[in-house]
């Protein structure tokens, strides 16, 4: 780690010219290993995204020696008949190199991030990466808007465009050649850039950090067209937690690129002047909302398509951008079904001896839990059937009782924690009921007993020990509100420590 810190202090003129040599440094692979170990966060289970169980310094040393001896990376050749290298699978070494590659390629962007902070009073907050930070923004802004553009983020016609764009940031030719080698080696770029990414286990487990970096760089390029929008649009809360580039360019990209776009598109900007335009991104989609007319939204739609295709060479089609009216649709994003609905209320106005009853209707953001997809996920994980009837989990009956309770408790807390912002809690209570009864049936199956006799013998209190409600947690933090727990259970609660949704979607 000290060696990396010394490297980061190098002169900026040399920062991008000697990255390839870092592949032969052992501490780079140790950093990639530590990234996988420190991935976990509160209320989330740790995913083994790297080669944690197989990592050792001896394997890394053998890998480096082999790279020194070879003129090219034969160890990554999938066409080779020999799938073992020094007693280990070649996939492991390919994986290790790609993880180390991801650590190295972030160095120039880390230097730019540090330099962007110098001489500026910018608040450094980890809350910018929270998924829940998006919803307070929606509550404040969306209720005053009319239309929304649902955009599927376009992807490059060829991954060589990504390499060409990176040449502006990285000047090490050997490093860029290695990047091309990796992209041709995996030859599955379309699955990575589209929504089929989840189906490709290679990107999910073995090379996640490497491909997420490339994906975020691609998204940054596609989003740079919004740099000419009003300055307040730049200060939206970040919705991407893994995006190293988002943090790097959150402040820096405004200064470097806005002059270029002003020069290129000043003749068209007057068509799209809209002080109420807002933008945010989630997963592989993005949303632009406005208070303007449908005609203005259509102009934005075709302007974006033409600009992506002609200026950035990104493949896009008009049918990938949908125009909807906020009052007529549900936005399905980040695990919630969100909509803007009128909220009528009656106000009594007293003026001297006269009293007036005034009906007021204000828009309110409604956030609902999607019950059908959640039950589908629970059924896929064998916690219930497709109709939502809880069943036992036979695969866990070999574990200790405490381990079984801990597993069910963790899943229940994850769901409760993430969906604490739901407007209606009944759906959330149903999910909790399924998990509780599935846990009881799993324990009863293990002890060859019925659920009723098992609960009667041990009591139902043992389930309450790990299924802690949100209001009980808050009662420890804010004792004054413990008396109004019934009212609190109906309130929406947003947390700023949730930076992943994968565990909640896949359970």
Curated annotation (Swiss-Prot):
Entry's Gene Ontology BP terms: mRNA processing; RNA splicing; tRNA processing
Keyword flag Cell division: no
GO cellular-component term (any): chloroplast
Main location: plastid
Keyword annotations from UniProtKB, A to Z: Chloroplast, mRNA processing, Plastid, RNA-binding, tRNA processing
Cell compartments where the protein resides: Plastid, Chloroplast
Record's keyword annotation contains tRNA processing: yes
Pfam family for this entry, one: MatK_N
Entry-linked InterPro entries: Domain_X (IPR024937), Maturase_MatK (IPR002866), Maturase_MatK_N (IPR024942)
Highest taxon listed in the record's lineage: Eukaryota
Molecular function (Gene Ontology), one example: RNA binding
Job description of the protein: Usually encoded in the trnK tRNA gene intron. Probably assists in splicing its own and other chloroplast group II introns.
Family to which this protein belongs: Belongs to the intron maturase 2 family. MatK subfamily.
Name of the protein: Maturase K
Taxonomic path: Eukaryota, Viridiplantae, Streptophyta, Embryophyta, Tracheophyta
């Amino acid at each position: 780690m000290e060696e990396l810190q010394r490297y980061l202090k190098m002169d900026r003129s040399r920062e991008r010219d000697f990255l390839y040599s870092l592949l032969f440094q052992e501490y780079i692979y140790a950093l990639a290993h530590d990234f996988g170990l420190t991935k976990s966060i509160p209320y989330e289970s740790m995913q083994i995204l790297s080669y944690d169980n197989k990592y050792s310094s001896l394997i890394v040393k053998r890998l480096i020696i082999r790279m020194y001896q070879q003129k090219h990376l034969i160890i990554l050749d999938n066409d080779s008949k020999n799938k073992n290298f020094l007693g280990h699978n070649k996939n492991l070494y390919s994986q290790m190199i790609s993880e180390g590659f991801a650590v190295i390629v972030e160095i120039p962007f880390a230097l730019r991030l540090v330099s962007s902070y110098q001489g500026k009073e910018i608040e450094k907050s980890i809350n910018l990466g929270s998924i829940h930070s998006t919803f307070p923004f929606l509550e404040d802004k969306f209720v005053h808007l009319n239309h929304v553009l649902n955009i599927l983020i376009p992807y490059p016609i060829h991954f060589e465009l990504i390499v060409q764009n990176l040449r502006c940031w990285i000047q090490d030719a050997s490093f860029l050649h290695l990047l091309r080698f990796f992209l041709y080696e995996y030859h599955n770029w379309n699955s990575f850039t589209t929504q089929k990414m989840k189906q490709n286990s290679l990107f999910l487990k073995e090379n996640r950090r490497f491909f997420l970096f490339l994906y975020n760089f691609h998204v940054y390029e596609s989003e740079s067209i919004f740099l000419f929008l009003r300055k307040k649009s730049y200060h939206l809360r970040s919705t991407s937690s893994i995006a190293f580039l988002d943090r790097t360019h959150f402040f820096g990209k405004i200064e470097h690129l806005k002059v270029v776009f002003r020069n290129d598109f000043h003749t068209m900007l007057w068509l799209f002047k809209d002080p109420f335009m807002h933008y945010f991104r989630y997963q592989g989609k993005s949303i632009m909302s406005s208070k303007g007319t449908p005609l203005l939204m259509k102009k934005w739609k075709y302007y974006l398509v033409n600009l992506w295709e002609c200026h950035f060479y990104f493949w896009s089609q008009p049918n990938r951008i949908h125009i909807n009216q906020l009052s007529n649709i549900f936005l399905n994003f980040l695990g919630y079904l969100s909509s803007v609905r009128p909220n009528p209320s009656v106000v009594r106005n007293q003026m001297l001896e006269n009293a007036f009853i005034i009906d007021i209707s204000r828009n309110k953001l409604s956030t609902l839990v999607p019950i059908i997809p959640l039950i589908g996920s629970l059924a896929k994980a064998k916690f219930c059937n497709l109709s939502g009837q809880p069943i036992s989990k036979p695969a866990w009956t070999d574990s200790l009782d405490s381990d079984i309770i801990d597993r069910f408790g963790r899943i229940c807390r994850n769901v409760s924690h993430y969906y604490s912002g739901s407007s209606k809690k009944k759906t959330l209570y149903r999910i909790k009921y399924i998990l509780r009864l599935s846990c009881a049936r799993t324990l009863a199956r293990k002890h060859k007993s019925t659920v009723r006799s098992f609960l009667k013998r041990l009591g139902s209190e043992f389930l309450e020990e790990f299924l802690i409600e949100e209001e009980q947690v808050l009662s420890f933090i804010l004792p004054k509100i413990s008396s109004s727990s019934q009212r609190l259970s109906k309130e929406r609660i947003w947390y700023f420590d949730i930076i992943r949704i994968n565990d909640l979607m896949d359970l």
